[in-house]
């Protein structure tokens, strides 16, 4: 990880945990230099417990550890934001977040739903069925849904179009899971294209030449 310049002159600095995937704020804890160094070394979040007066690895009792993905320091170098992958609920009450905030549904939520279904033993799961049938079945279903999107677009039925796009996206994420493609890879490719200069049609072949 990068070398961080954090001001520990007052002993403790606040450390905010944020879900790396959903960006939900999970909790607030405090770190001293030793806790921060241990977090870097172990790759899991370690706080300094003000009540216990000792280092405290988050989840050391419950097993609900917080794996570190990235660390950010604010402009004053006295507050830390840590992107984590939580291993279970963060709050001692059993809630995902200590702030009880609800995360809006997103494509990351859809990806996680597909992953959870793939790992489940639910024989009635449609996702599980598709993945068991394999790529040929999944691509066939995706093609059918994509065709339905085109049909509804031509018909101009907005409500039906939205419904079919939702179906298509679901099957796309099942296909991505089957191929081992994470949505972050798609985001990275889109970001690459977004930042690429002169990315205009003049660089490409004419359609009739494809």
UniProtKB/Swiss-Prot annotation:
Official protein name in the record: Histidine biosynthesis bifunctional protein HisIE
Alphabetical list of InterPro entries matching this protein: His_synth_HisIE, HisE, PRA-CH, PRib-ATP_PPHydrolase-like, PRib_AMP_CycHydrolase_dom, PRib_AMP_CycHydrolase_sf
GO molecular function terms listed in the Swiss-Prot or TrEMBL record: ATP binding; phosphoribosyl-AMP cyclohydrolase activity; phosphoribosyl-ATP diphosphatase activity
One GO biological process term: L-histidine biosynthetic process
A family per Pfam: PRA-PH
Gene Ontology CC terms, in alphabetical order: cytoplasm
Localization per Swiss-Prot or TrEMBL: Cytoplasm
Protein's organism: Staphylococcus aureus (strain COL)
Region Phosphoribosyl-AMP cyclohydrolase, annotated ranges: 1-106
Catalytic reaction annotation: 1-(5-phospho-beta-D-ribosyl)-ATP + H2O = 1-(5-phospho-beta-D-ribosyl)-5'-AMP + diphosphate + H(+); 1-(5-phospho-beta-D-ribosyl)-5'-AMP + H2O = 1-(5-phospho-beta-D-ribosyl)-5-[(5-phospho-beta-D-ribosylamino)methylideneamino]imidazole-4-carboxamide
HAMAP family named in the record: HisE (MF_01020), HisI (MF_01021), HisIE (MF_01019)
């Amino acid at each position: 990880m990068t070398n961080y310049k954090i001001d520990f002159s007052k002993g403790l600095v606040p450390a905010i945990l944020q879900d790396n995937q959903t960006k939900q704020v999970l909790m607030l804890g405090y770190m001293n230099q030793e806790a921060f160094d241990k977090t870097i070394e172990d790759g899991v979040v370690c706080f300094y417990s003000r009540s216990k007066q000792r280092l405290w690895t988050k989840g050391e009792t419950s097993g609900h550890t917080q794996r570190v993905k990235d660390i950010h320091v604010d402009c004053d170098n006295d507050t830390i934001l840590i992107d984590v992958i939580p291993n279970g609920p963060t709050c001692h009450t059993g809630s995902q977040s200590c702030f009880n905030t609800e995360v809006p549904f997103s494509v990351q939520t859809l990806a996680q739903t597909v992953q959870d279904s793939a790992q489940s033993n639910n024989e009635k799961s449609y996702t599980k069925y598709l993945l068991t049938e394999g790529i040929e079945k999944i691509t066939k279903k995706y093609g059918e849904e994509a065709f339905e999107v085109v049909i509804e677009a031509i018909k101009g039925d907005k409500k039906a179009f939205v419904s079919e796009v939702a179906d298509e996206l679901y099957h796309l994420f099942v296909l991505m899971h089957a191929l081992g493609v994470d949505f972050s890879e798609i985001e990275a490719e889109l970001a690459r294209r977004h930042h690429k200069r002169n990315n205009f049609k003049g660089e490409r072949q004419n359609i009739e030449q494809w």
